[in-house]
Amino acid sequence: MSFEEFTPLNEKSLVDYIKSTPALSSKIGADKSDDDLVIKEVGDGNLNFVFIVVGSSGSLVIKQALPYIRCIGESWPMTKERAYFEATTLRKHGNLSPDHVPEVYHFDRTMALIGMRYLEPPHIILRKGLIAGIEYPFLADHMSDYMAKTLFFTSLLYHDTTEHRRAVTEFCGNVELCRLTEQVVFSDPYRVSTFNRWTSPYLDDDAKAVREDSALKLEIAELKSMFCERAQALIHGDLHTGSVMVTQDSTQVIDPEFSFYGPMGFDIGAYLGNLILAFFAQDGHATQENDRKEYKQWILRTIEQTWNLFNKRFIALWDQNKDGPGEAYLADIYNNTEVLKFVQENYMRNLLHDSLGFGAAKMIRRIVGVAHVEDFESIEEDKRRAICERSALEFAKMLLKERRKFKSIGEVVSAIQQQS
């Protein structure tokens, strides 16, 4: 079988593809054996085919982009080129944070296909762990490290402007995925759209209130402008709890197909916003045996620790590289400790506010927009689910409109507790 043109693979044709690709076959022993490979299609996301492949001497994952959105169908076309940007970002971020990004073994641009490390059990999607009430002792440490390194080292704090513009230009090609985000995060929840849904009839008035909130629309317009215009760093672009796989001592970030040079706060906010959604969903998963109160406190500690560790590590990287190639703040201008500290405090304050705003926007779209989260969807009783969603929605609306009043992540955590 020829693979010179794009062909959607199935379990049978994937065997032929792997055996004809040394970079893959050598990883799992398929180059030395005619034994059948064990292949399982496990894609549960919105966009792609995902296969787990096990051979005589190893395993790997194959991810293939389709020319449409899988969860909707061919009526919503989507470029296969997103696979190129995903593979490129996995490699770039993997170089910067190798402990927290799976290795890429092979990329085929024609087939829109990536072969990468299989994150074997007990790795599970973080979102599923949060639903199950599992604590991860290294989560805040690992995620803050990943975000600090990937965001700092792809920004003008480390790049010179020529290098940065070249990198920005390359990722401008991921325009379709950016436009999808613009639509589902910054537009559809604030207007009537066939793609929107919510827990009806319980949240009918809540969804209408979002569409009629002028102050909310003013804030979301500012965030959309920042998302479209601010090429601050190479961001993952979809860093929710479904894009992280975990064990008790491992944290791996996957699926950066939405990556581009955008505002740092979009990644930080997406991640923290999804932790906040997980917090508000806990009451829907509580039982007589486990009221989830202790687990909710763990989530809040994780939120606070993640930002505080990120802040500390980001500033440390800045200090270590203040005389390096970065051209955002030239060393001969910001040339004393006092002025540099002032600049850093201002930068991180703005970044916190950006992160809170984007996090709130991501929360809102998951409640009254398209593509909801399993944290809420797995709450079987509609009324119970709606109560949890309403609390999260009210908090997100407040956070979006009043984000600039928060001086620390601790104040945000206190506000979450008051809302619950």
From Swiss-Prot:
One Gene Ontology biological process: L-methionine salvage from methylthioadenosine
GO-annotated molecular function: ATP binding; identical protein binding; S-methyl-5-thioribose kinase activity
Subunit note: Homodimer.
Modified residues (N-acetylserine): S2
The name this protein goes by in its record: Methylthioribose kinase
Protein family (similarity comment): Belongs to the methylthioribose kinase family.
Pathway: Amino-acid biosynthesis; L-methionine biosynthesis via salvage pathway; S-methyl-5-thio-alpha-D-ribose 1-phosphate from S-methyl-5'-thioadenosine (hydrolase route): step 2/2
EC number: 2.7.1.100
Residues bound to substrate: N46, D238, R365
Disruption phenotype: No visible phenotype under normal growth condition. Not able to grow with methylthioadenosine (MTA) as unique source of sulfur. Imbalanced AdoMet homeostasis in sulfur-limiting conditions associated with a retarded growth.
Pfam family, one: APH
PANTHER family per UniProt: METHYLTHIORIBOSE KINASE
Function text: Catalyzes the phosphorylation of methylthioribose into methylthioribose-1-phosphate in the methionine cycle. Contributes to the maintenance of AdoMet homeostasis and is required to sustain high rates of ethylene synthesis.
Class of this enzyme: transferase
Activity dependence on pH, as recorded: Optimum pH is 8.5-9.0.
Species name: Arabidopsis thaliana
